[in-house]
């Protein structure tokens, strides 16, 4: 802890502007950029104040400008500041599983200290080119629409795009649940600038679904790192790196395949923009920081597969005003292997997960990677849905009866496909009342092939809604027929 630090380099606060603190050090003893500074003192009310800051600028005249990782309430000019001579470091290893940390690696779940001495600095180089694994392989998620139309790459980066309230966090929770159960893999969750209530709900739901076991933490499958909306921008800007550092240890030292969830990568950019303005940098397009591309690259390039293990990253991307050309989502796009775009139109129809089958893309959807059969089924599904989309204007003006026989068949099959792309989630059982379904890729393909071939043309549309495999569709259709 801070109290055990040797005070070899001590400065004092000269200025405080919100989360930005200026510190003066003795001549010739300036800390380096990204060094952690600690301030431990008592405020005027006699309460303990403990703040960690990160050096961002060297101002000249032996002064540095640092950004605080927690609230600066209670700090005053003249307080003593200790240079730790190292970057912020966080605990790593199996002892982190089942625990909740803040940006500087302190546990915030009231379960006592972390039982590990292993710590890693949050700033590191990306793996070298020669260490990277370049052979592509698909990561099965058990979610039909994802596995069929926009499959995820093992060790790749996936973006979950959507406006407010279309279900990004629910999909993330379902993926954590499915990966833990189907693959037995560990996950690291970075809560970047999202609602504290959601963080609390996520933790409780993970306990309910046995992803976290508070009685026996060694059985837990996920470590959580939170820097929520109420935290200063410094914490929100760095919490993604803290989570990534924990994931890197599982990849490089434990030699595991890890899932890294970042919810929400837009808040990481937003926090960087706030810090940039506080540091007095000239804003770039739409008021974002001029270093937007660099900051994003430093984070994203560390998320990759090496010959030892992989980090597969799933990042929720809030799209401001549903505008995909905004610099924040646009910069994120450049790094992604797959995009899962959530559509407000589908959500309003009650189709969940509200993944847009035409807008969602993946570099893995190639015959050489997924095989010809998978590729052909996926493209046939998309072309049927695309034709339905083109016909919707005609239907709205003239009605369904004015369409040709072939087009009416396309519409009927497209509506079944649209409904069959929905599926009940394990983590949403409380809301839907339907038991969750994990659908294997071969079952997904079998179902869509049967719809496309016309084998199921005589089944009613509602039989395809909110089910798992095609066998459940047939059973539901028989049940509906019996009730009619």
From Swiss-Prot:
User: What family, per the record?
Assistant: Belongs to the ATPase alpha/beta chains family.
Which reactions does this protein catalyse? Answer: ATP + H2O + 4 H(+)(in) = ADP + phosphate + 5 H(+)(out)
| Membrane topology category | Peripheral membrane protein
Among Gene3D superfamilies, the record links this protein to:
2.40.10.170, Bovine Mitochondrial F1-atpase, Atp Synthase Beta Chain, Chain D, domain 3, P-loop containing nucleotide triphosphate hydrolases
CC per GO annotation: plasma membrane-derived thylakoid membrane; proton-transporting ATP synthase complex
Under the heading PANTHER family, the entry gives: ATP SYNTHASE, ATP SYNTHASE SUBUNIT BETA, MITOCHONDRIAL
| UniProt enzyme class | translocase
Listed InterPro entries: AAA+_ATPase, ATP-synt_VA_C, ATP_synth_F1_bsu, ATPase_a/bsu_AS, ATPase_alpha/beta_chains, ATPase_F1/V1/A1_a/bsu_N, ATPase_F1/V1/A1_a/bsu_N_sf, ATPase_F1/V1/A1_a/bsu_nucl-bd
**Keywords assigned by UniProt?**
ATP synthesis, ATP-binding, CF(1), Hydrogen ion transport, Ion transport, Membrane, Nucleotide-binding, Thylakoid, Translocase, Transport
Tell me which residues bind ATP. Answer: 162-169
Q: Which PROSITE patterns match?
A: ATPASE_ALPHA_BETA
Entry superkingdom? Bacteria
| Compartments where found | Cellular thylakoid membrane
**What is a GO molecular function of this protein?**
proton-transporting ATP synthase activity, rotational mechanism
| Protein name as annotated | ATP synthase subunit beta
Q: Which gene encodes it?
A: atpD
Among Pfam families, the record links this protein to: ATP-synt_ab, ATP-synt_ab_N, ATP-synt_VA_C
Q: Briefly state the protein's biological role.
A: Produces ATP from ADP in the presence of a proton gradient across the membrane. The catalytic sites are hosted primarily by the beta subunits.
User: Which Enzyme Commission number(s) are listed?
Assistant: 7.1.2.2
Organism expressing this protein natively: Trichodesmium erythraeum (strain IMS101)
Share what the entry says about its subunit structure, partners included.
Answer: F-type ATPases have 2 components, CF(1) - the catalytic core - and CF(0) - the membrane proton channel. CF(1) has five subunits: alpha(3), beta(3), gamma(1), delta(1), epsilon(1). CF(0) has four main subunits: a(1), b(1), b'(1) and c(9-12).
């Amino acid at each position: 802890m801070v109290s055990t630090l040797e005070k070899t380099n001590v400065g004092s606060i000269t200025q405080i502007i919100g989360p930005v603190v200026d510190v003066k050090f003795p001549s010739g003893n300036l800390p380096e950029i990204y060094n952690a500074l600690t301030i431990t003192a008592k405020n005027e009310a006699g309460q303990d104040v403990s703040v960690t800051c990160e050096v961002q600028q060297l101002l000249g005249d032996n002064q540095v400008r640092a950004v605080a990782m927690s609230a600066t309430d209670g700090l005053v000019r003249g307080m003593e500041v200790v240079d730790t001579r190292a970057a912020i470091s966080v605990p790593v290893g199996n002892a982190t599983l089942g625990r909740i940390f803040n940006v500087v690696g302190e546990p915030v779940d009231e379960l006592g200290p972390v039982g590990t001495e292993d710590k890693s600095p949050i700033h590191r180089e990306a793996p070298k080119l020669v260490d990277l694994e370049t052979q592509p392989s698909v990561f099965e998620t058990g979610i039909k629409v994802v596995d069929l139309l926009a499959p995820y790459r093992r060790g790749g980066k996936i973006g979950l795009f959507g406006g407010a309230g279309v279900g990004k966090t629910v999909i993330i929770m379902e993926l954590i649940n499915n990966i833990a159960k189907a693959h037995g893999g560990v996950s690291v969750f970075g809560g970047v600038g999202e609602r504290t209530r959601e963080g609390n709900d996520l933790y409780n739901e993970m306990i309910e679904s046995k992803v976290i076991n508070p009685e026996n933490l060694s059985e837990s499958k996920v470590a959580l790192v939170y820097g929520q909306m109420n935290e200063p921008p410094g914490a929100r800007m760095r919490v993604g790196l803290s989570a990534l550092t924990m994931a890197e240890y599982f990849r490089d030292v434990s030699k595991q395949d890890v899932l890294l969830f970042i919810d929400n990568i837009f808040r990481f950019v937003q926090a960087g923009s706030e810090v940039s303005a506080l540091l007095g940098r000239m804003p770039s397009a739409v008021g974002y920081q001029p270093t937007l591309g660099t900051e994003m690259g430093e984070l994203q390039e560390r998320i990759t597969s090496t010959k030892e293990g992989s980090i597969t990253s799933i990042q929720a991307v809030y799209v401001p005003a549903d505008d995909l050309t905004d610099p924040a989502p646009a910069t994120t796009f450049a790094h992604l292997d797959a995009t899962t775009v959530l559509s407000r139109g589908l959500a309003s129809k009650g189709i969940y997960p509200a993944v847009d089958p035409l807008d969602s893309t993946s570099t893995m959807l190639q015959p050489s990677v997924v095989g010809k059969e998978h590729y052909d089924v996926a493209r046939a599904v998309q072309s049927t849905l695309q034709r339905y989309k083109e016909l919707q204007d005609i239907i709205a003006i003239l009605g369904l009866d004015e369409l040709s026989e072939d087009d009416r068949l396309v519409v009927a099959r497209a509506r079944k496909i649209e409904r069959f792309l929905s599926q009940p989630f394990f983590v949403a059982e409380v809301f839907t009342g339907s038991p969750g379904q994990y659908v294997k890729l071969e079952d997904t393909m079998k179902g869509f092939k049967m719809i496309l071939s016309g084998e199921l043309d005589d089944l009613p549309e509602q039989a395809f809604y909110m089910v798992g495999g095609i066998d459940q569709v047939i059973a539901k259709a028989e049940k509906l027929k019996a009730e009619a």
